[in-house]
Amino acid sequence: SRQVKEQLIKHNIGQRIFGHYVLGLSQGSVSEILARPKPWNKLTVRGKEPFHKMKQFLSDEQNILALRSIQGRQRENPGQSLNRLFQEVPKRRNGSEGNITTRIRASETGSDEAIKSILEQAKRELQVQKTAEPAQPSSTSSSGTSDDAIRSILQQARREMEAQQAALDPALKPAPLSQADLAILSPKLIPSSPMSSVSSYPPLALSLKKPPTAPDTSASTLPNPPALKKESQDAPGLDLPGAAESAQGVLRHVKSELGRSGVWKDHWWSTVQPERKSAAPPEDAKSEEAGGTKEKGGGQGHGPIAASSRDPHHRRSTGRNGPALSPRTPQSSELSLTGASRSETPQNSPLPSSPIVPMSKPAKPSVPPLTPEQYEIYMYQEVDTIELTRQVKEKLAKNGICQRIFGEKVLGLSQGSVSDMLSRPKPWSKLTQKGREPFIRMQLWLNGELGQGVLPVQGQQQGPVLHSVTSLQDPLQQGCVSSESTPKTSASCSPAPESPMSSSESVKSLTELVQQPCPPIETSKDGKPPEPSDPPASDSQPATPLPLSGHSALSIQELVAMSPELDTYGITKRVKEVLTDNNLGQRLFGETILGLTQGSVSDLLSRPKPWHKLSLKGREPFVRMQLWLNDPNNVEKLMDMKRMEKKAYMKRRHSSVSDSQPCEPPSVGIDYSQGASPQPQHQLKKPRVVLAPEEKEALKRAYQQKPYPSPKTIEELATQLNLKTSTVINWFHNYRSRIRRELFIEEIQAGSQGQAGARHSPSARSSGAAPSSEGDSCDGVEAAEGPGAADAEESAPAAAAKSQGGPAEAAVAPEEREEAPRPAEKRSRRPRGPGPGPGRRGGGGPAPGAPAAPAAAARGPSRRPGARAKPRRRRRRRRRHARGGGRRYLSRPARGGPCRARDGAHRSSALPSTSAPAAARRPSSLQSLFGLPEAAGARDSRDNPLRKKKAANLNSIIHRLEKAASREEPIEWEF
């Protein structure tokens, strides 16, 4: 088991292939045997059989080489199931070890010497089988072994085949198999046909599938029988066991293969594609057919065919094998010419073919297998997969290669697998042998040893095709050469990326692709209902990027892949300028040009990424923008779209509004320019609800009782005030929002005042720790509370109604107005005593009022312990009240604050004698808050003006809202 595992890993042979061809077991059974082999003495007779076969397999190097060639062809034709080989013959597992090697070697690869040795071995094994036939009665045919019957069948088949070949000779002359090779090969066919031995049927299946490459579906004859006839002539000593009946069975099988291969051949010649991997089952048959493939390139030049191509004497009978001549997986039409040069005939010559025949299913990506040498270089090295994938991604982005093409041509994986592997590579040590293969391929690709002739297909291979397309399509897209390259690559890359066409065929398909989409392109791009009114624009359309979207999505992707590096910042800047200058919206631009939403367009235009950091998908919008900028008629087309949208919108709006009230054209125009939908515009036309002062008072009193009224309360209020329920709900919502805004303004102002006072108080710098806590507890709170009172008083004329809700409010209001400057006065008095510390918010400024100092000093020590916790509690309480209700919030100035209560008589006596700055006594709340010019300093210069501006702006907005709300007549908002 260990030796077998080593050989399988060394030659990159899968356990599934090994199990099918050598052990006759499933992959799971093989894995179990190799991973956990039982001791010999514990095995049954049947359990020992796989080990006998493995020993026989290891005894000859040719077995390993043959199995490796089968594995290589299986990788080249991944769509083919291995079970296809086992359909024609019943499967059994009791073949002798000699037969195991037979079936492996039947599909051997290698040089001429290897092929000859295989053929000689086949002769010997046929003789062994012939002698063993009496022991296998089931394998002998009951019809007798008449050579004459078989020869007559073979001669008839030969005549039919020569007639077919004569019809194809002008167009095809690939190298046929030599008669000698066919003669040597064919003994395997007839004897193994009647035999049910599994060991010999793969040669039968393979060699039967070899010739069915005749292109004509109607010609249902077999190319093989001539070879069989020659064999029967060349090896007369062999007693052919197959009777007429078995030979007829062989003929029937081969005819069915011929029918399928004829269909495939028509398709192959219709697209002139030499790639075998894209062919359906008959194609797989050809890849399985031959004696072997070359090992070195991991390619698929089969033994007899390769030999025939080297021997000029062989160029005769199997003209249908043309495509099989290319020794490795053909990746482009140039490789088909390689095969053609061997056959001395151009393969691009026109042939009667039916391009209608579709492929049975899309071909899976397939790549040539890696050679053992390539495996050995990297398999046992430690590879940094993260760095490797990073380099691969960079190279893909630099060369504009899509992951799909890279996966199909280099890794043999789907786009999803490639994306997953490149984004989340596993560590090398955690990868299985199969998991390491893609990374080995990536490394070889980076080193230029793999796939270099494949990837340029995307941008360079079809250069002549591009020129022919542009010459054919000069009326189309004359302004933008790059857009002409789009259909080119889409034709080669998108429909059948793994099968590039010849230039003549692709030009034909490209002209169709380029000519057809142009008229419908505008419609598909616009995607708007009023598009039919825009046919004249489609004449001027060709130079715009809009037609690009009319092609397949891949066409723009391929254009992106070939695009040179673009200045994304410059492109977005120009686009923004054009849109702004012409009053075009981003939504219209995004939907019409880029196929994106307004949000995506805004993001692209405001924060464009550098080109090299963008994926292919991310580059697409910038390519579209560039093409749009290059179009001289770009603005006119967008303006037309805008006008059509406007007309459609007005029609919809008119139909929706006509029932209730007529819409006025000017207002509709304004609504459209704002880009709003019909429903919001309809709501904006409703008359504005204006509440009477009595209604406002009643609602405010209700708010003080319950800021969040229940539905029942709302209904009662609406009934009492004769208002709509929705009006009452909206009033409560708006009033709560106003309270929150005022609290926000107060916090901003309090913070700016505290910072200004703390930074510039001379005594603050020399104050001690204990007095600073006292100052913080007192001034900090009042500085936060006093301004709120003044601001609420000044900014809202009806603010007093918020707090008291009764007669008391008249008595409280004057007191509040007088208290507005108190924070400034307190700040001016306090610092004589121990003032707040330098970093405190509630510091004071230099001012008269010396008597305040001793009192502050006396108060300080007794209040120090709880000084810090109280302001925090108060702030939390204040936020709760701001959310829950405005009653206590607005009555806060009346109760004064904790410090005012503690100051006692000293505070009340100091107030009248204090001469505060004149600015602090002004009615304007802003001036009372920010009226101390000496409070501004160098360190505060950066953030204080910004805070002032914010507060002033919010104050002015609220003031205007209050003024507008207090008016009787309905007016529009003015900002």
UniProtKB/Swiss-Prot annotation:
Pfam families: CUT, Homeodomain
Skewed-composition ranges (Basic residues): 861-890
CDD domains on file: homeodomain
Protein's organism: Canis lupus familiaris
Disulfide partners: none
Location within or outside the cell: Nucleus
The UniProt record lists the keyword Repressor: yes
Protein name in UniProt: Homeobox protein cut-like 1
Region (Disordered): 90-113, 126-148, 209-246, 262-369, 476-549, 652-687, 752-949
Site entry (Cleavage), positions: Q87, E88, P191, S192, S193, P194, M195, S196, S197, V198, S199
InterPro entries: CUT_dom, HD, Homeobox_CS, Homeodomain-like_sf, Lambda_DNA-bd_dom_sf
Tree of life domain: Eukaryota
Keyword flag Nuclease: no
Gene name as annotated: CUX1
Biased composition (Basic and acidic residues): 262-297, 937-946
Biased composition (Polar residues): 328-351, 476-489
Cross-link position per record: Glycyl lysine isopeptide (Lys-Gly) (interchain with G-Cter in SUMO2): K229, K255, K286, K724
GO cellular component, one term: nucleus
Residues the record lists as Phosphoserine modifications: S207, S349, S499, S509, S710, S777, S925, S956, S966
Residue spans binding DNA: 1-73, 374-461, 557-644, 684-743
Coiled coil: 113-169
Free-text tissue specificity from the UniProt record: A broad pattern of expression observed in tissues of diverse origins, such as cartilage, liver, brain, lung, heart and skeletal muscle. There are 2 distinct protein species: the larger one (230-250 kDa) is found mainly in adult brain, lung and heart, and the smaller one (180-190 kDa) predominates in early embryonic tissues.
Other remarks on this protein: Asn-730 may participate in regulating DNA-binding activity by promoting homo- and heterodimerization.
Subunit record text: Interacts with BANP.
Physiological role: Transcription factor involved in the control of neuronal differentiation in the brain. Regulates dendrite development and branching, and dendritic spine formation in cortical layers II-III. Also involved in the control of synaptogenesis. In addition, it has probably a broad role in mammalian development as a repressor of developmentally regulated gene expression. May act by preventing binding of positively-activing CCAAT factors to promoters. Component of nf-munr repressor; binds to the matrix attachment regions (MARs) (5' and 3') of the immunoglobulin heavy chain enhancer.
Stretches with biased composition (Gly residues): 838-847
Molecular function via GO: DNA binding; DNA-binding transcription factor activity, RNA polymerase II-specific
